[in-house]
Amino acid sequence: MALKDAMRELASAKDATTWEGVDTPEGFDITLRWDAKDELLLIPMRTLMRFGLHEKFSIDVDKWSSYMEEVRVYMHDFPYHNLTHVTDVTQTLGTFLATEKAMGLLTDMDRLIMLVSAISHDLDHPGTNNLYQVNKKSELSIKYDNKSVLENHHIDLSQSVMTKLGLFDNLGEADLKEFTDKMRELILSTDMAQHFGLCGTLQEVTKTWKATKEGDSLSEEDKMVLMKSLLHLADISNPFKKWTICKWWSDRVFQEFWEQGDREKAEELPVSMLCDRDTTKQDESSVNFIDFLVCPFLFACTTAFPELVNHCEILAVNRKEWSDMTVKRLKDTMIAEDEQEKLTEAVTMWEGKTTAFNTEFAELKKSIQ
């Protein structure tokens, strides 16, 4: 069946369950569908339908299908930044938006902008990061003055394609401006260079929101921080998917990193962090990614949206898997090299990291009860 026909059939369904677990945070395994491109392209529409957005905004199904075909073309077959990734981010974001606090906070327009941003946020990704673009002095880095190079490209290309297709021509002038402006802000927030700043701002906004009396509303600025945070969280959600999915994605992340590192070596460019296959350890790097980036951000989001606590539970399980793998590798290496003293120090350090994580998680659970 052609994509447009399948999309029409989906959009006309009254009860579009379509895929088992698609509406649940833990129950949907997108890795089983990674090579079923047409099926992947239906998932964003299914997510819009969950909130009735296709009807509320009178989205033209054929135009939407055409946009999905453009997404298919522009999402290249890199190990990680591919069609499966942007579809996964969209489906995951849909589960965040369905939480009780998010449903009460966001408007239908907010949800539409966020979901369209999710499917568009990596359009035409080149399989290398911003630092590579800057060091390479690529056309994109020059065009965007070395600032959020790829994110600006994703925004400009996706909005250009939408305009060409007339995808949102039915929106009024004010709504269209809100759509394009907020979409730009949201996709820019997926730049990992913005991570720590966004995390700090999120923690402050969360304190404000918790202190707000029932019935009072957040400022538009603070609400945008929460919108950015949920999209960014969906973009870095691999570590808190069930272990088999987490490991599947991690393998692809590091494959793409190492392919970039190989290019950097061949082109005599500085090798980016985590991109040297000869020195980067996937297990240790994954624990550090969880501890320094994912954990603080997920915990802050969970303070704002308590239903996300189940993801924290899964994160703890996956962190233990990576930590156990790291300790085993260290033991195998150091015992073979007869470095018992170094091994004892290393194991003690990793046990200390785990204790710190577990303590912080216990405090989080207590605070949201």
Task: Please tell me what each predicted stretch does.
Residues 2-39, 47-55, 80, 95-108, ...:
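Divalent metal-dependent phosphate-bond-processing catalytic cores, especially two-metal-ion Mg2+/Mn2+ enzymes
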Residues 52-78, 98:
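Internal amphipathic alpha-helical repeat/solenoid segments
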Residues 68, 72, 90, 117-120, ...:
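Generic structural concept
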Residues 81-93:
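Hydrophobic alpha-helical transmembrane segments corresponding to the first two to three helices
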